[in-house]
């Protein structure tokens, strides 16, 4: 399970240094892809396989299912960390997430989300009503 918030930066070669705690759980090789809300999702190889198997069951006749699978898989790539724990974020994902230099990685249960520091700050300053969300989660039995 991934938890916590980590602030760091890309180096001059667009590599991020994965924080040690996240690296321990992600492993030396993991998958990143376009996430929702303008961030990048990172999954362990095992978790990616589980997600892939679930998405394979979506009906090809459903337009929304096809669109989501295209979106999700078109941005996916495997990241292999070097001995210093650095991994390359491809240009297309940097552009998608608005990442220039400063990034925030957050643990969110089975995935890590990688945000530009600016987008993460804006997200946290938005008018999200967490009390209302908590009520809705309660209605779902959570």
From Swiss-Prot:
Pfam families in UniProt: MraZ
Matches recorded under CDD domains: MraZ_C, MraZ_N
Keyword Ion transport: no
Gene Ontology molecular functions: DNA-binding transcription factor activity; transcription cis-regulatory region binding
GO cellular component, one term: cytoplasm
Annotated keywords: Cytoplasm, DNA-binding, Repeat, Transcription, Transcription regulation
Localisation: Cytoplasm, Nucleoid
Subcellular location, principal: cytoplasm
PROSITE patterns (UniProt xref): SPOVT_ABRB
Membership in a protein family: Belongs to the MraZ family.
The protein, known as: Transcriptional regulator MraZ
Source organism of this protein record: Clostridium botulinum (strain Alaska E43 / Type E3)
């Amino acid at each position: 399970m991934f938890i916590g918030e980590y602030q760091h930066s890309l180096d001059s070669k667009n590599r991020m240094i994965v924080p040690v705690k996240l690296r321990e759980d992600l492993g030396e090789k993991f998958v990143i892809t376009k996430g929702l809300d303008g961030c990048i999702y990172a999954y362990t190889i095992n978790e990616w396989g589980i997600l892939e198997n679930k998405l394979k069951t979506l009906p090809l006749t459903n337009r929304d299912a096809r669109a989501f699978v295209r979106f999700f898989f078109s941005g996916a790539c495997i990241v292999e960390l070097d001995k210093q724990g650095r991994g390359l974020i491809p240009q297309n994902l940097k552009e998608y997430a608005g990442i220039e230099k400063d990034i925030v990685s957050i643990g969110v249960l089975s995935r890590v989300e990688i945000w530009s520091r600016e987008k993460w700050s804006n997200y946290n300053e938005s008018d999200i009503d967490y009390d209302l969300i908590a009520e809705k989660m309660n209605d779902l039995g959570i």
